[in-house]
Amino acid sequence: MERAIQGNDAREQANSERWDGGSGSSTSPFQLPDESPSWTEWRLHNDETNSNQDNPLGFKESWGFGKVVFKRYLRYERTETSLHRVLGSWTGDSVNYAASRFFGVNQIGCTYSIRFRGVSVTISGGSRTLQHLCEMAIRSKQELLQLTPVEVESNVSRGCPEGVETFEEESE
């Protein structure tokens, strides 16, 4: 069950919640361990006057299968190397394996969610559409993380995200 987090509760939750830490679980879809910031790191990187601000050290993502939810906080430095690393935090195979542990005869709901710098994306579907859900989740994750302004110098030129068209104004 999810609860709304308001005001100072966000900091308290970040300190107490470890986001299902560890990568050794045989049922977790994640292949990287939890990288939640310590209380000291959280305080150093967040504005005390705006406790609803996301921690800029990384992002949160989760996979839910029925009532079971697996969560991770991953560090992301907004570099190509870091992007490549976090895109490998789960694969279609690891998600399928984890989900299969909770499937019975009936279809269950499956949900992927990611939150980065104040933007949340959630994708839901039934267990029979899990492959399509994984494909949409990886595209959403790539677009969300790549659309972030690059805060380090980089020679990499970023084009328009897939599905976005640019138009030039015609001069009269």
UniProtKB/Swiss-Prot annotation:
Outline the segment boundaries, as ranges, of region: Disordered: 1-38
Q: Which GO annotations describe the biological process of this protein?
A: symbiont-mediated suppression of host innate immune response
Q: Name the SUPFAM superfamilies on file.
A: Tombusvirus P19 core protein, VP19
List compositional bias (Basic and acidic residues) regions by residue number.
1-20
Classify the source by domain of life.
Viruses
Q: Which keywords does this Swiss-Prot/TrEMBL entry list? A: Host-virus interaction, Inhibition of host innate immune response by virus, RNA-binding, Suppressor of RNA silencing, Viral immunoevasion
Task: Give a GO cellular-component term.
Answer: virion component
How does the annotation summarize its subunit structure?
Homodimer.
By sequence similarity, the record places it as follows: Belongs to the tombusvirus protein p19 family.
Protein's job:
Viral suppressor of RNA silencing which binds specifically to silencing RNAs (siRNAs). Acts as a molecular caliper to specifically select siRNAs based on the length of the duplex region of the RNA.
What is the protein named?
RNA silencing suppressor p19
Organism this protein belongs to = Tomato bushy stunt virus (strain type)
